[in-house]
């Protein structure tokens, strides 16, 4: 009998051991089904310290794990975040941000005004000037950046009674809007974010989520909420949106940003798509130096507008026609639109060429538009379209650009930042237009006069505004973007 005891005991122990694994796996499966959101992204960056090379989807990671003094919703309303109240002086130069007393880091310690000031000092030292315009508008900030003064003595960012007090060099109506951008979200020990893959477990987080795992192909975020809803979000590197969508269709992804165009109608019919306007616009420069008359430029614009109109009839989820407006918001100005429509319909003699050429940056938007334009011209005119899609350094060759009849320009059509918007066109303007644009005297009237001129000359004309599309699974009942085009992780339910 004794000779059987040892084998029987071993079988019992091994069986109990395996049952333990089965139980653990069941728990893991339940959690995966109920609590985990899988978000497909095209790449995962190691460096989250500076913004020079981050895409909008890379920025989403920072938005998930950190909060700013203020935020901006999809309707461009400025909302409190770390600051519970904002007080602006009568002259518009000084701002007081009263920090909420009930906000905490991911380790449970309280977030204070001193934390914000330390972060702003680090941000001024570590990030590139082009990414921190809002802070460089602060009195003394540029001198500190250039090493001419200390932060404590020279920069007008101070702490008082758990408030952050900021004084600008001059009134800036865009200051709060700029401050909502992801780069100004509070990050502890900023230098450690340069290798966040290595340091993710050493830093603490000010946002709705914290990073709990960082691998080459996946980042795991866990909710900081204490309400019992410990939601987990996996950001999974799928290399391209087609791979994300394939995984979405078999239930392995719950969020896909801008799924393939061919899938949009099906997703919409299934109730699995949110479509929102975004600032990305496409504009057409028509080269007046290539012997194309005013009437020729007018006809080209008319033809290309018709090609976009035909295309939009089956792709209304992807974009909205500009219809003569440089900003989406201006489409409500019916008088202006009617005037521009009348101008566009003038007819004069023009002898069209056999071939027209288009140059543009090589991206998915431009590839699709060039294909559509080429096809429409072949079917509706006697003009052939030849186009070139080039990488950034090749595209920026000014001598090369002069040899093309048209150039597609992708621009951020943010009506709150007209200066940045119009300066994107500066290389395509006359010397007198450049002088106006590069002066410090631009206001809304100046921009409007400039806009009317380049439209009436058919030099730079608006074509379309793109939409943001989000595919989401049945696991999600609510999801939103913020006013900067980033994912609002606090909205996910």
Report the location of each language-model feature.
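N-terminal lobe/hinge region of extracytoplasmic solute-binding protein
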Residues: 40-90, 121, 204
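A structural "hinge/loop" feature
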Residues: 41-62, 82, 109, 175-185, ...
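Aromatic- and charge-enriched surface segment that lines or borders ligand/interaction sites
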Residues: 85-135, 292
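Gly/Pro-rich hinge or "lid" segments in bacterial periplasmic/extracellular proteins
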Residues: 168-234
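Periplasmic-binding protein-like
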Residues: 286-337, 369, 451-460
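Extracytoplasmic/peripheral linker and loop segments enriched in polar/acidic and small residues
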Residues: 311, 383-395, 409, 418-477, ...
């Amino acid at each position: 009998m004794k000779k059987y005891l040892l084998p029987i005991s071993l079988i019992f122990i091994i069986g109990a051991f395996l049952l333990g694994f089965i139980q653990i796996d069941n728990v893991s499966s339940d959690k995966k089904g109920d609590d985990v959101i899988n978000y497909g992204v095209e790449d995962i960056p190691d460096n989250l310290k500076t913004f020079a090379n981050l895409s909008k989807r890379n920025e989403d990671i920072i938005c998930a794990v950190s909060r700013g003094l203020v935020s901006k919703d999809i309707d461009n309303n400025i909302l409190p975040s770390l600051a519970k109240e904002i007080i602006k002086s009568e002259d518009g130069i000084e701002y007081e941000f009263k920090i909420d007393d009930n906000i905490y880091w991911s380790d449970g310690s309280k977030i204070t005004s001193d934390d914000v000031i330390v972060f702003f000092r680090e941000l001024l030292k570590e990030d590139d000037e082009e990414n921190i315009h809002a802070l460089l508008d602060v009195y003394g900030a540029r001198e500190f950046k250039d090493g001419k003064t200390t932060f404590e003595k020279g920069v007008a960012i101070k702490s008082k009674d758990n408030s952050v007090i900021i004084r600008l060099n001059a009134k800036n109506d865009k200051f709060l809007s700029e401050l909502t951008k992801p780069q100004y979200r509070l990050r502890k020990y900023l230098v450690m974010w340069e290798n966040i893959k290595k340091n993710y477990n050493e830093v603490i987080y000010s946002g709705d989520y914290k990073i709990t795992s960082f691998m080459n192909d996946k980042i795991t975020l866990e909710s900081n909420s204490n309400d019992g809803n410990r939601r987990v979000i996996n950001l999974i590197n799928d290399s391209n949106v087609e791979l994300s969508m394939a995984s979405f269709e078999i239930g392995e992804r719950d969020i896909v940003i801008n799924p393939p165009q061919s899938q949009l109608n099906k997703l919409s019919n299934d109730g699995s798509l949110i479509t929102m306007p975004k600032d990305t616009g496409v504009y057409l420069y028509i080269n007046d130096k290539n012997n194309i008359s005013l009437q020729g430029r007018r006809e080209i614009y008319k033809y290309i507008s018709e090609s976009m109109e035909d295309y939009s009839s089956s792709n209304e989820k992807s974009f909205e026609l500009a219809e003569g407006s440089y900003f989406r918001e201006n489409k409500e100005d019916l008088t202006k639109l009617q005037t521009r429509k009348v101008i566009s319909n003038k007819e004069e003699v023009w002898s069209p060429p056999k071939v027209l050429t288009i140059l543009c940056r090589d991206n998915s938007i431009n590839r699709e538009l060039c294909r559509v334009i080429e096809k429409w011209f072949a079917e509706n005119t006697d003009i052939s379209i030849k186009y070139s899609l080039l990488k950034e350094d090749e595209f920026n060759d000014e001598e090369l650009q002069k040899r093309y009849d048209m150039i597609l320009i992708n621009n951020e059509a943010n009506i709150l930042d007209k200066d940045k918007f119009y300066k994107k066109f500066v290389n395509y303007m006359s010397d007198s237009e450049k002088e106006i644009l590069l002066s410090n005297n631009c206001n809304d009237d100046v921009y409007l006069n400039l806009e009317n001129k380049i439209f009436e000359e058919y030099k730079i004309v608006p074509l379309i505004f793109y939409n943001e599309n989000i595919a989401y699974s049945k696991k999600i009942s609510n999801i939103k973007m913020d006013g900067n085009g980033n994912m609002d992780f606090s909205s996910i339910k």
